[in-house]
Amino acid sequence: MAATIFSSFMVMLQLICVIIVVAYLLTRSKFFLEVLEGHSTIKTQIVLILIFGILSIYGTINGVEMLGAIVNVRDLGPMLAGLIGGPFVGLGAGLIGAAYRGTLGGITVVSCSLATVLAGLFGGLIWLWCKKKFCGIKVAVIFAILMEGLHCLLTLLIVRPFDQA
């Protein structure tokens, strides 16, 4: 049992590392410089939506079964999109991730899809609150923890029968 949990944890860590590497490479691109300088074009925003939307799909595809549930990092793409590019970028990436999650079906399809969209939207609202700038690692980590709590709460509120949530 402990070996299985450790193995699953390592797979999740690999997923997160891939997303971090992509985000790091993105920070070295002209798109990110436009965002930092505060004058990103609609083209730049669409590119960011697509990149972070694909990361959301990647996080879904590579989910790991743990204790009977699929654990994934789908919401991380839209969260980062919102925190870096604002509500339009976060919402766009969230809609891509949610649309893909919707194709998979299952008992948690509505709660998971809704949580993914909200992750991008709330990330964007935090970006606005921080005067259209990245808010820093501390705020991002707190946001991620709170967002995962909201995701769990949505699942408990929406999924029926309750004992399968």
Where are these regions (language model features)?
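Hydrophobic transmembrane alpha-helices
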Residues: 1-79, 89-165
